[in-house]
Amino acid sequence: MTVQQAFEQHVMHTYARFSVVFERGEGCYLEDSEGRRYLDFVAGIATCVLGHAHPVLSAAVAEQARTLIHVSNLYYTPQQACLAEWLTAHSAADQVFFCNSGAEANEGAIKLARKYGRTVLGIAEPQIICAHQSFHGRTMATVTATGQPKYQKHFHPLVPGFVHVPYNDFEALRAQVTDATAAVLIEPIQGEGGVVPGDVEFFQKLRRFCSERRILLMLDEVQTGMGRTGRLFGYEHLGIEPDVFTLAKALGGGVPIGALCAKEAFAIFEPGDHASTFGGNPLACAAALAVCQTLEAEQLVDNARERGAQLAAGLGRLVERFKPLVRTARGRGLMQGLVLSEPRAAEIVRLAMEQGLLLVSAGPEVIRFVPPLIVSAIEVDEALAILEGVFARLPVTVTA
């Protein structure tokens, strides 16, 4: 039985997978079971910030596995303490709750907001405002928070207590605020919603408004956090600090870990309020700490900013050459999106893969670029050249 046959027979069909089996990786490249190499601009969907088989991360995981993998949160472990110290020293947060994924981190934020609403604001049924086209996860609470009905189909009744408003529209958001509003949960850049950057003026107005109304401002940094945008956290581009923010994806460099981060005044969980069996285990924390230290040692946040500017400029040239099919490019750092005038993103992703470049869509009309933060100038140029070749051979059906 082949790998793909085993998947077909024994793995639930929750993904429409590409017909390729990856067996190894190094740097920004993956190699499939037939020995073919691919330039990886997906990075596990904005996760493998150090690329594949990075020696520091590999050594940290191997060494920790030889020492201690898991004991539960009934006890103290040095790896969790060190990681929490690093995150709070480098961010607006004072305290951290560790879990295993972005959905779990956002689930924790939702619970924190509800407790804040009930115990601090005295709201019997707290409400959370989210944005249309947002994505916060696939658990019942986070898929309800997600502002995309396609992810909610078949899963009603949804969790009550969520209101959705247009992204980057302060007046629309303010109009939905009531005495029951406890929090706003929003992304600095909408990732799955089409790589839509947050507007600075919107977020600064939102920050002031939330402070005035004692509403929690919670940022979902699952995709933007840990250097992806050319700053360590996405909120740094916006000139604000959140009360609460969530991390995952890049935090572990491919090892599952998530984090709910909060300022001390809002870190109101008590024993019994929330928990995670695996959250913050020594193995995951050792991996995440290696990622954090490597981001600094190799100046990868700076690299994300510089290579992001190079990528954005190259995408801009593609926009000019291939109009009207390609409408615009947008993003920050190494989180870029190429916006099409037709729903052909999946087709272009497939054609690019055939030419050895891995990309991922963000909706039917947006191609997303989220390479490892170690990506070089040569590799960015290689990706742009492959993509240019794909567009050059693509039949254009849009009329000017």
From Swiss-Prot:
<comment type="subunit">
    <text>Homodimer.</text>
</comment>
<feature type="modified residue" description="N6-(pyridoxal phosphate)lysine">
    <location>
        <position position="249"/>
    </location>
</feature>
<dbReference type="InterPro" id="IPR015421">
    <property type="entry name" value="PyrdxlP-dep_Trfase_major"/>
</dbReference>
<keyword id="KW-0808">Transferase</keyword>
<keyword id="KW-0963">Cytoplasm</keyword>
<keyword id="KW-0032">Aminotransferase</keyword>
<dbReference type="InterPro" id="IPR005814">
    <property type="entry name" value="Aminotrans_3"/>
</dbReference>
<keyword id="KW-0663">Pyridoxal phosphate</keyword>
<dbReference type="GO" id="GO:0003992">
    <property type="term" value="F:N2-acetyl-L-ornithine:2-oxoglutarate 5-aminotransferase activity"/>
</dbReference>
<dbReference type="InterPro" id="IPR050103">
    <property type="entry name" value="Class-III_PLP-dep_AT"/>
</dbReference>
<dbReference type="GO" id="GO:0030170">
    <property type="term" value="F:pyridoxal phosphate binding"/>
</dbReference>
<dbReference type="GO" id="GO:0006526">
    <property type="term" value="P:L-arginine biosynthetic process"/>
</dbReference>
<dbReference type="InterPro" id="IPR015422">
    <property type="entry name" value="PyrdxlP-dep_Trfase_small"/>
</dbReference>
<dbReference type="GO" id="GO:0042802">
    <property type="term" value="F:identical protein binding"/>
</dbReference>
<feature type="binding site">
    <location>
        <position position="276"/>
    </location>
    <ligand>
        <name>N(2)-acetyl-L-ornithine</name>
    </ligand>
</feature>
<feature type="binding site">
    <location>
        <position position="135"/>
    </location>
    <ligand>
        <name>pyridoxal 5'-phosphate</name>
    </ligand>
</feature>
<feature type="binding site">
    <location>
        <begin position="220"/>
        <end position="223"/>
    </location>
    <ligand>
        <name>pyridoxal 5'-phosphate</name>
    </ligand>
</feature>
<dbReference type="InterPro" id="IPR015424">
    <property type="entry name" value="PyrdxlP-dep_Trfase"/>
</dbReference>
<feature type="binding site">
    <location>
        <position position="138"/>
    </location>
    <ligand>
        <name>N(2)-acetyl-L-ornithine</name>
    </ligand>
</feature>
<feature type="binding site">
    <location>
        <position position="277"/>
    </location>
    <ligand>
        <name>pyridoxal 5'-phosphate</name>
    </ligand>
</feature>
<comment type="pathway">
    <text>Amino-acid biosynthesis; L-arginine biosynthesis; N(2)-acetyl-L-ornithine from L-glutamate: step 4/4.</text>
</comment>
<dbReference type="GO" id="GO:0005737">
    <property type="term" value="C:cytoplasm"/>
</dbReference>
<dbReference type="Pfam" id="PF00202">
    <property type="entry name" value="Aminotran_3"/>
</dbReference>
<feature type="binding site">
    <location>
        <begin position="102"/>
        <end position="103"/>
    </location>
    <ligand>
        <name>pyridoxal 5'-phosphate</name>
    </ligand>
</feature>
<dbReference type="InterPro" id="IPR004636">
    <property type="entry name" value="AcOrn/SuccOrn_fam"/>
</dbReference>
<protein>
    <recommendedName>
        <fullName>Acetylornithine aminotransferase</fullName>
        <ecNumber>2.6.1.11</ecNumber>
    </recommendedName>
</protein>
<keyword id="KW-0028">Amino-acid biosynthesis</keyword>
<dbReference type="InterPro" id="IPR049704">
    <property type="entry name" value="Aminotrans_3_PPA_site"/>
</dbReference>
<comment type="similarity">
    <text>Belongs to the class-III pyridoxal-phosphate-dependent aminotransferase family. ArgD subfamily.</text>
</comment>
<keyword id="KW-0055">Arginine biosynthesis</keyword>
